[in-house]
Amino acid sequence: MTTTTTATTATTRRPRTTSTTSTTSTSTAPDLPDELLAVLKRMRLPYLRDAAPEVLATARAQRWDPAEVLRVLITEEIRGRDDATRRMRRKAAGLPAGKTFESWREHDSTIPPGTQTGLATLEWVGRAENLAIAGPSGTGKTHFAEALAHKVIDVGMRVSWFTLESLTAAIGRATVDGSVAKTIARITRAELIVIDDIGMLPAGQAAGEAFYRVVDAAYERRSIVVTSNLHPSGFDTIMPKTLATATVDRLLHHAHVVLTEGTSLRLSEATAGRGVVPLA
C-alpha cells in the first residue's frame, strides 16, 4: 500500500483530502491546455490528468506551496493506479461471492477470536505458511477464506482461487495442450492460493494429481488455504491414498489447522427468515 507523507510548512494551507476538498467545483475548474493533456497522456498519467483541473484550481485559490501541488497530483496518480491494480487482481483471482471482513460476523464463528485476529494480520502469508479450515457445511469456512483473500489483495498481493473441481479442470486443459508447467507457474505467482470445498464431491486420480501438483509447486514458497468438511488427514478417503499422503505431508508441514463447529449459519438465517428480502 502506498504511504503518503503529510509534512508541510506552517504557511502551507493544505486540503483535508486530495479528492473532495476543493472550494472550486469541477464544473468551474479550467480545462488543461491541449499540449499539457497530450504530455500527460504520453506519460501515461491518467489519474493525475483527471484530478489536475480541480487540484490546480484549489491550489490557486488557497495559495498552496508548489511542492504541495506536486505531492497531491502524484498522490492521486498513485491512488488511482493502486485502485486499478486491486480491481484487476480481484477479477483475475476469481473470488466467488464478494464476502469480506466487513460482512464477517466474528462472534457467530467458532474460530477463536485470537486465531481470527492472528490470521487477519496476514503475517503467516509473508512466511509462506498454509491454512486448513475444516468443519461442517455452513460454518463460515469459505466466508473466512474469502475475507482473507480480499485482504491479501488489499495489501498489494495476488490471489488464485479454485474449488478442487475447477483446479482439476484447469490442469486437465493444460494437460491436453501441453501447458501444465506454464499453468502451475501462473497459479503459483499468487502469494495466496485458495482451494475451496475439498471433499464435497468424490475426487479421482485427476483431482488428486492436480491438487498434488499445486501443493508441491507452492511448498515453502507460497501460502495455500484449503477449506473442507474433512480434516486434511482424511483426504485419503476421497482421493488416491498415495497422492493424498504426499500432498497432505507438504500441506501440513507449515500449516495452521482451524476447526469449525456448530450448525449451518446459512440454515440458521433461513429458518429465522433472514435469507431473503421480505415480499411485503
Regions found by a protein language model. Name each.
Residues 147, 151:
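Active-site signature of alpha/beta-hydrolase-fold catalytic machinery across serine-
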Residues 99-120:
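N-terminal pre-Walker A segment at the start of P-loop NTPase domains
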Residues 128-144:
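Walker A/P-loop nucleotide-binding motif
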Residues 120-128:
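Phosphate-binding P-loop
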Residues 37, 41-96:
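Interdomain "pre-motor" coupling segment immediately N-terminal to P-loop NTPase/helicase cores
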Residues 104, 145, 163:
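Conserved hydrophobic/aromatic pocket- or pore-lining residues that grip, position, or stack substrates
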Residues 1-47:
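Charged, compositionally biased N-terminal leader segments and the immediate start
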